[in-house]
Design a protein with these regions (language model features):
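P-loop NTPase Walker
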Residues: 1-55, 59, 129, 146, ...
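Coupling/switch/interface segments within P-loop NTPase motor domains and analogous charged loops
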Residues: 62-126, 130
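Conserved helicase NTPase motor core
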Residues: 4-5, 12-13, 32, 61-64, ...
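Short acidic/histidine-centered micro-motifs embedded in hydrophobic/aromatic stretches
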Residues: 36-39, 88-94, 108, 140-141, ...
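Alpha-helix N-cap and coil->helix boundary residues
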Residues: 31, 83-87, 154
């Protein structure tokens, strides 16, 4: 199918799929309908090698992500009282949502510099362990499509109709 439909929640994705099925006589499996994270996961699973991921990469939820951050900080002797793991987590996710890897983040503030170092160590752990957090799914998919012309062209040709539900809310 030539339809890509994306939304923010699983519930909204199911509703969107049901609406599309009622409107269009197409096998629903042929359409790509889901959340941003779900569709990015699908894309990365199909093109895991090009995205630099193992075929069976794990997805970390927020709790798992925080656990990895704490492990990184402990292994590197970083004081979790001075640098709160949840603040580090928010910093990392904000950077990824802005499309920035640790190597692309700059700051003149010492606290941010420490966060950037933790972010870099965290990235290395995820890469070594073959894992992605939620923000990483979006960033890797963006990087894959922006850097790989052949894959980007394939999806530009495949999807003639792109529906974004609740786009005005972004």
């Amino acid at each position: 199918s030539e339809i890509l439909a994306v939304t923010f929640t699983n519930k909204a994705a199911k509703e969107m799929l049901a609406r599309l099925q009622n409107m269009i006589p197409i096998n629903p499996r042929a359409m790509w309908v889901g959340t941003f994270h779900g569709l990015c996961n699908r894309l990365l699973r199909l093109h895991h090698q090009e995205a630099g991921l193992p075929a069976t990469f794990a997805i970390l939820d927020m709790s798992d992500q925080l656990g990895v951050i704490k492990r990184v900080m402990k292994a590197n002797g970083i004081d979790t009282e001075e640098f709160k793991p949840r603040e580090v987590q928010n910093f990392i996710n904000r950077c990824k949502e802005e499309g920035k890897r640790a190597s692309e983040v700059y700051s003149k503030f010492s606290k941010d510099k420490a966060y950037i170092q933790i972010y870099a160590m965290y990235e290395a752990v995820l890469q070594r362990e073959g894992a992605c957090d939620f923000a990483e799914l979006l960033l890797r998919a963006y990087e894959l499509l922006s850097r790989n012309e052949m894959i980007r062209h394939h999806y530009q040709e495949r999807f003639r109709f792109i529906l974004v539900d609740e786009f005005q809310d972004t």
